Amino acid sequence: MSKAGASLATCYGPVSTHVMTKAENIRLLILDVDGVLSDGLIYMGNNGEELKAFNVRDGYGIRCALTSNIEVAIITGRKAKLVEDRCATLGIVHLYQGQSNKLIAFSDLLEKLAIAPENVAYVGDDLIDWPVMEKVGLSVAVADAHPLLIPRADYVTHIAGGRGAVREVCDLLLLAQGKLDEAKGQSI
């Protein structure tokens, strides 16, 4: 879903021309992990190991974004080795874990990559994400985000976190930039 106004039909449903215009300029996609790349559930094993499920469609979308010159970064409040491993598998080199104040990592990324805030999209699911979301060019909430986050976002995915929402956002960015048909990734 998107805010009111003229819209463009996509395979995910209508997207406002305002959102598509913002998406044209995105050079960096920042993602939260729990509730965005995963469904927000954490499975704890008897020996203290932590397990999460990641969607391969999201992985494919991330690989397509990366091969289409859109940087991808992770800023997450929790810290887990399996997130490091997933990032390594996908080719994500900008990983910030254990971030209770996500603005610090956001500022570091802008400086490191020499990117303006209006060229950044951020995908979040909860209120901890809003301080960064309100500063970027395109703020995205997943379909099952916290109810207070949804009306604030520029775009709300049709798909829930951990179920392909990130792929939806990647496809949206690539479509807006005229790169969707040429995008090549690999299923991971």
Swiss-Prot record:
Reactions catalysed, as given in the entry: 3-deoxy-alpha-D-manno-2-octulosonate-8-phosphate + H2O = 3-deoxy-alpha-D-manno-oct-2-ulosonate + phosphate
Pathway in which the depicted protein is active: Carbohydrate biosynthesis; 3-deoxy-D-manno-octulosonate biosynthesis; 3-deoxy-D-manno-octulosonate from D-ribulose 5-phosphate: step 3/3; Bacterial outer membrane biogenesis; lipopolysaccharide biosynthesis
Enzyme class: hydrolase
E.C. no: 3.1.3.45
MF annotations from Gene Ontology: 3-deoxy-manno-octulosonate-8-phosphatase activity; metal ion binding; N-acylneuraminate cytidylyltransferase activity
Cofactor: Mg(2+)
Chain sites annotated for binding substrate: 34, 55-59, 63, 78, 86, 102
The keyword Metal-binding is annotated on this UniProt entry: yes
Signal peptide: none
One GO term of the biological process aspect: lipopolysaccharide biosynthetic process
Gene3D superfamilies, sorted: HAD superfamily/HAD-like
Keyword Metal-binding annotated: yes
Binding site for Mg(2+): 32, 34, 125
Entry keywords, A to Z: Hydrolase, Lipopolysaccharide biosynthesis, Magnesium, Metal-binding
Coiled coil regions in record: none
InterPro entries given in the database record: CMP-NeuNAc_synthase (IPR050793), HAD-like_sf (IPR036412), HAD_sf (IPR023214), KdsC_fam (IPR010023)
Function noted in UniProt: Catalyzes the hydrolysis of 3-deoxy-D-manno-octulosonate 8-phosphate (KDO 8-P) to 3-deoxy-D-manno-octulosonate (KDO) and inorganic phosphate in vitro. Also catalyzes the dephosphorylation of phospho-tyrosine in vitro.
Similarity remark: Belongs to the KdsC family.
UniProt xrefs under PANTHER family: HAD SUPERFAMILY MEMBERS CMAS AND KDSC (PTHR21485), N-ACYLNEURAMINATE CYTIDYLYLTRANSFERASE-RELATED (PTHR21485:SF6)
Subunit structure: Homotetramer.
Protein name in the entry: 3-deoxy-D-manno-octulosonate 8-phosphate phosphatase KdsC
Gene: kdsC
